[in-house]
Every structure is written in C-alpha cells, then in structure tokens.
C-alpha cells in the first residue's frame, strides 16, 4: 500500500475538492491514460486495486505508471466515542484528485488492450473517468509517413 515515509504534519484539514487540475492533466510517460472527470479522494487501497487490475490484464506486455500518490492522512475517531477530545487518529491515506487529472498511464500495448485495461481499472475508481490517448503532434506524423515511403 502506498503512503509517505514521513510527513511534516500528522493531521491535515479536509480542504476543498472543487476545481480542475492545472498540473498532471496531460499524458506524460505512456501512450494511454485514465483521466478523472470529477474531483474526489482516492484511497491507497483503491489505487492498489486499480494497479492490480491493469497489470493483470496487460500481463508482461506493457508498463504502468501511477501518476497519483496518497499523501493526505484521513483521521477517524473510534466507534461509540463522545465528541470532543481532539481530532481522531490517522486512519488511512488518500490522494486528492481534481477534475482532469491523469491517474494511470500505460505504454507498450495495443490501443484495444489499453482501452480494456482502463475499462477494468475504472470500475475500481470512486470517480468518473475516461480513456485518453497521447496527442501525436502533426510534425511527428509527417516524419513517420516520410520514413514509410
């Protein structure tokens, strides 16, 4: 399970989940990606379940990049505890995901295999997602055509 090795503060405020992602919203490492369409918290367990779903489907064919990291501690108070007495103990770690954030990337597989792997992965996510392919610049397409001739 993913979690930070050490943190500056053990407990953090909840924050706001609105707005779009300004960073991490383009495909950077692989050729295909899973992009968030809404904001939310994704737990370390959900990230691990998604990673396993993707890697099981693509087998040894491709490579997977996880673009989000659960660095926010979520606290909980024990059951049947009266209010007061301070904030609860850290219970789990979540990644804050905004609309448009690239969460997972795949490379080295066919578009059909990537789409199916991301479809299976999307079922593990608590937010709506979409399949995204890397934008190929027009100049790169022209050089590929020239090399083929």
Swiss-Prot record:
Domain of life per record: Bacteria
Alphabetical GO biological process terms: translation
One Gene Ontology cellular component annotation held by this UniProt entry: cytosolic large ribosomal subunit
GO molecular function (one): structural constituent of ribosome
Keywords: Ribonucleoprotein, Ribosomal protein, RNA-binding, rRNA-binding, tRNA-binding
InterPro entries, sorted: Ribosomal_uL16 (IPR047873), Ribosomal_uL16_bact-type (IPR000114), Ribosomal_uL16_CS (IPR020798), Ribosomal_uL16_dom (IPR016180), Ribosomal_uL16_sf (IPR036920)
Pfam families for the chain: Ribosomal_L16
Family annotation (NCBIfam families): rplP_bact
Function: Binds 23S rRNA and is also seen to make contacts with the A and possibly P site tRNAs.
Family the entry assigns: Belongs to the universal ribosomal protein uL16 family.
Record note on quaternary structure: Part of the 50S ribosomal subunit.
Protein's recorded name: Large ribosomal subunit protein uL16
Source organism of the structure: Dehalococcoides mccartyi (strain ATCC BAA-2266 / KCTC 15142 / 195) (Dehalococcoides ethenogenes (strain 195))
Lineage summary: Bacteria, Bacillati, Chloroflexota, Dehalococcoidia, Dehalococcoidales
Underlying gene: rplP
């Amino acid at each position: 399970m993913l979690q930070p090795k050490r943190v500056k503060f053990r407990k953090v405020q909840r924050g706001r989940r609105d707005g779009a992602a300004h960073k991490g919203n383009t495909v950077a490492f692989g050729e295909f990606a899973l992009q968030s369409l809404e904001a939310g918290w994704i737990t370390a367990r959900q990230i691990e379940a998604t990673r396993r779903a993707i890697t099981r489907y693509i087998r040894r064919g491709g490579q997977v990049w996880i673009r989000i990291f659960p660095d926010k501690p979520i606290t909980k108070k024990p059951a049947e505890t009266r209010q007061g007495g301070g904030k609860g103990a850290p219970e789990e770690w979540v990644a804050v995901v905004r609309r448009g954030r690239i969460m997972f990337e795949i490379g080295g597989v066919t578009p059909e295999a990537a789409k199916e792997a991301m479809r299976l992965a999307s079922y593990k996510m608590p937010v709506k997602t979409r399949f995204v392919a890397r934008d190929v610049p027009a100049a790169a397409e022209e050089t590929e055509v020239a090399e083929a001739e």
